[in-house]
Every structure is written in C-alpha cells, then in structure tokens.
C-alpha cells in the first residue's frame, strides 16, 4: 500500500499483473497519510483494480495527471443515465456497446500500444456503479469471464458499489446488483438476445427516442416494448403521442404479427387489425401487478404468435416489462432479478414498484410451467408443435405447486377505462418526463453547433470591420505622422 504522493508514479512505472489468474485479482489502494489501520479503507482512498495486464478501473478523488506511459479516460459525463426519479442505472444497451467499442479501439490503437489504459471514475457512487457495470459487461462479453469472475474482480478488497433501484417515486425496497446484471448479460449471450456483431446502434438510438416511437427490442425478433399509441399523432402535455400508423410500416418490416395492449383504449384496434396484425387487449391498472388469468392469457398469445410481438401499456414500462419478464422467466429460466436487470438494460425504467416483488413471487411457478412446457414439446416434430399448443396450455393449468393444484380463481371485475384518468397516472408522468428530457437533450445538442457557428460568424464580422474601417484609418494616421 502506497501513499497518495507516491502511488500514481510508482504504478505508472510498474508492470500490471495479468488478470488471467482470476481467483486473485489485483488491487492498489492509495492510502491517505493519516490512515494507519490497514483493515479499513478511508472513503477518500484512490483505488485501482486490474482488469487485464493493460486495462484498469480506477476510483479517484482528484483528477489524474497524464503520463507518457498511462492513458486516463472517463465516461462519467459522456455515457449518462437518463433517470425518471431516483433511479440511476444500469446504463442501456447502446451505452454498453459504445463503451466496449471505445475500450477495444484504445487497446488496439498503435499510439497506445505501450500505454496502460485506465478508466477512472470520481467520488459519485452512482457513477462508480455504472462504471463498474460497463467494465463488468466488457469482461463478460469480450474477455470471456464468468459473471462471478467479473464481479469478484470489481469488489476485490473492500471495494463496494450501491445497487440499482427502480424508476418509481418514493422509497425503494427492491434492488438489483452488479452480479444480477452480469448474469443477465451472460444469459442474454447464451440465448442469443445479445450479439454485438449484429447489433444496430443507429436503429436502437433512433427508435428509443420519444419523438421517433419510443420502442426497444427486449428479445430480438421476438419482443418489442413500446409506449401506447393514441388515436392521432400530436404533442400534448409535454410528450409525443403517436398514432398506430406511426408503427405499422416498421412493424411489418420487422415481422411483427401481434400487438398486445395492456392499458385503456386510446386508439381503435382496427387501425392495426385492418393492416393485418393480430390485436389483443389485456387490461390491468397502471402501476399494479397482473392477475394469474392475465399472465396466462399473455403467455398463451405469445406462444401461439407466428412472428414478433409488440407490447405496450401507457408508457411501455411497468405493465409491459412485467409481462415480458414473465415470458422470459418461463421459457429461459432466468431469475426474477436477472430478468429485471436484462429488460432494464434494453429499456431503462421497465418493471416498477410492487411488480418487482410480483416477479420474485412468480419465479418458481413460472419455472415449473416452463419445464412442463418443454417436456410436452420434447420428442415432437416441428410440424406438430403448433397443434400441441392448446393441449399444452390446458395441461399447464393443472400443474400442482408444493402439492396444491392450480384451481380456477375468481375472475376480477372487468377493467374500467375510468380507472385511468387522462394525464394522471404513473404512465403519463413517466412518458412525459422521458419526452421532455429527450427534447431538452436534443436542444442542447442543437445549441452547441449553433453557438460555434455564431461565434465564427461574429469573428468574421469583427475582422471585416477591422480590415475595412479601422485599419485604413490607422494607416492614414500613421502616414500623417510620418510626413
């Protein structure tokens, strides 16, 4: 352990230990001169964590000085999470992709071949968590580390990170950890959800914007989550409202065959059905969890859909994420925490409040249903699968869990459109916030080049005034003095 005054220079001159020995990752903590107890780290200590022999993650409490053999960089103000409330991460899929490309480019750069690459973050614990998330994803995706190996590298010693929370207003009693996120990424790669070789960054960043449709793929070629359309396109109450026609051509191009609406009717379903889509309504209240009947209905529709399924509620966050998560848990046996982590990486804000605990509660039963589903399909030819679905679904209803059979439950009262007041629900607030936030970001991006252009024009005008008016007068005066 070295003091701050000697830490950086000595590290820069030293050779980093390779991280192929993953069971004992290396860490350097730079202690303050006043700290004497080696068992506890001062919160203001700088920390360096070895990722590979050339790559490190650093938590620094003062900006590092450049060196000839060390390249420092930070993404704290470059890849920023756009929060809804007190949520702060994890960063979305496009940011993970951008980060991985950045690291690969730096490691392969001819000008940096002899340099150590240090990704540093500052004192903000939320930024630290997102920096660790990005580095961990890079280890899992490009270095072939297991989630546990990546996580162990990041928490070596007493280094810790705050967990991620949901987008709900108020207190939070459910969190997802970095390890949950790494497991989600690993399983997404395993099941083909995540493949950066075919990832379309431009498409992701275009369509996730509120003004361009506010949609994200959760499972490529299978599930889209998007905000609820309205009867006509307009800008109202601070957010963009899109009509069904906005989505029809894109859905057709991407082989979407089924639309599932989870909120009250804001548009005529005929807009989609007349265009050749199947359209289904499964209403339940904004911010609530679905009944077993709704979960079963959703799974039945998805398992019988010929193509991709586009799901929406009002904001395309809470209800939408919850039911898509149920499908993922049933058919891919991911845990509730892993599933929540994955859907939020794809579309930040998904699954809100009590819907998180609902998924934890449903995990075991959904796994059992998935096992039963697979057993029924096993041994059957592909051509027989479709005919087997109705029988399978009726069989799933009779599964017994912990010795208690699934019996018919009393249906809830029909959902009323009056349960959602225009402009007053959680979904309204979330989508309005997202739309205003992105509009502000776009305005900033537009303002920067305009400011540069304005400054350049002002310089030209000033130079023109000097050359055409002031300079001749000065020359005339000087000539007069000379004579």
From Swiss-Prot:
Motif (Nucleolar localization signal): 1-53
Biased composition (Low complexity): 12-26
PROSITE patterns: TYR_PHOSPHATASE_1, TYR_PHOSPHATASE_2, TYR_PHOSPHATASE_DUAL
Domain Tyrosine-protein phosphatase: 213-373
E.C. no: 3.1.3.16, 3.1.3.48
InterPro entries on file: CDC14_C, DSPn, Prot-tyrosine_phosphatase-like, PTP, Tyr_Pase_AS, Tyr_Pase_cat, Tyr_Pase_dom, TYR_PHOSPHATASE_DUAL_dom
Compartment(s): Membrane; Nucleus, Nucleolus; Cytoplasm, Cytoskeleton
GO molecular function, one term: protein serine/threonine phosphatase activity
Renumbered residue ranges of the record's region B: 212-378
Region named Linker: 198-211
Region of interest (Disordered), residue spans: 1-45, 407-426
Active site positions: 313 (phosphocysteine intermediate)
Note in the entry: May act as an autosomal functional substitute.
The protein's role, per its UniProt record: Dual-specificity phosphatase. Preferentially dephosphorylates proteins modified by proline-directed kinases.
Protein name (database record): Dual specificity protein phosphatase CDC14C
Annotated organism of origin: Symphalangus syndactylus
């Amino acid at each position: 352990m070295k003091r701050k005054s000697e830490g950086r220079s000595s590290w820069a001159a030293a050779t980093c230990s390779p991280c192929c020995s993953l069971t004992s990752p290396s860490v350097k903590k730079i202690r303050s001169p006043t700290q004497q107890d080696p068992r506890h780290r001062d919160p203001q200590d700088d920390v360096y964590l070895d990722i590979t022999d050339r790559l490190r993650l650093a938590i620094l409490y003062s900006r590092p000085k450049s060196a000839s053999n060390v390249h420092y960089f930070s993404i704290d103000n470059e890849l920023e999470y756009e929060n809804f409330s007190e949520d702060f991460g994890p960063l979305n899929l496009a940011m993970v992709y951008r980060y991985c490309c950045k690291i690969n480019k730096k490691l392969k750069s001819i000008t940096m071949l002899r340099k150590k690459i240090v990704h540093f973050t500052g004192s903000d614990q939320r930024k630290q968590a997102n920096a660790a998330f990005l580095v961990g994803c890079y280890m899992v995706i490009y270095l072939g580390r297991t989630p546990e190996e990546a996580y162990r590298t990041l928490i070596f010693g007493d280094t810790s990170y705050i967990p991620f929370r949901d987008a709900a207003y108020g207190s939070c009693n459910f969190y997802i950890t970095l390890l949950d996120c790494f497991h989600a990424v690993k399983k997404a790669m395993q099941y083909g959800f995540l493949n950066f070789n075919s990832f379309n960054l431009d498409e992701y960043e275009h369509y996730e914007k509120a003004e361009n449709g506010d949609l994200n793929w959760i499972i490529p070629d299978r599930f889209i989550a998007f905000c609820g359309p309205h009867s006509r396109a307009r800008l109202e109450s601070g957010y963009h409202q899109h009509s069904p026609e906005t989505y029809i051509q894109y859905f057709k191009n991407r082989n979407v065959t089924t639309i599932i609406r989870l909120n009250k009717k804001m548009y005529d379903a005929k807009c989609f059905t007349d265009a050749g889509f199947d359209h289904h309504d499964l209403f339940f209240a904004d911010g609530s969890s679905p009944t077993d009947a709704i979960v079963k209905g959703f799974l039945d529709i998805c398992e019988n859909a010929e193509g991709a399924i586009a799901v929406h509620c009002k904001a395309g966050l809470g209800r939408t994420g919850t039911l898509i998560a149920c499908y993922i848990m049933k058919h891919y046996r991911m845990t509730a925490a892993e599933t929540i982590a994955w859907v939020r990486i794809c579309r930040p804000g998904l699954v809100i409040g009590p819907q998180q605990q609902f998924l934890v509660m449903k995990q075991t039963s959904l796994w059992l249903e998935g096992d039963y589903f697979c057993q029924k399909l096993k041994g059957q030819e592909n051509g027989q699968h479709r005919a087997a679905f109705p029988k399978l679904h009726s069989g799933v209803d009779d599964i017994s869990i912990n010795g208690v059979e699934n019996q018919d439950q009393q249906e809830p009262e029909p959902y009323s459109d009056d349960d959602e007041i225009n402009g007053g629900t959680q979904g309204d607030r979330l989508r309005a916030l997202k739309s205003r936030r992105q509009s502000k970001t776009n305005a900033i991006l537009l303002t920067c080049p305009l400011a540069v252009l304005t400054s350049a024009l002002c310089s030209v005008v000033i130079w023109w005034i000097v050359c055409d008016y002031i300079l001749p007068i000065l020359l005339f005066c000087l000539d007069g003095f000379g004579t």
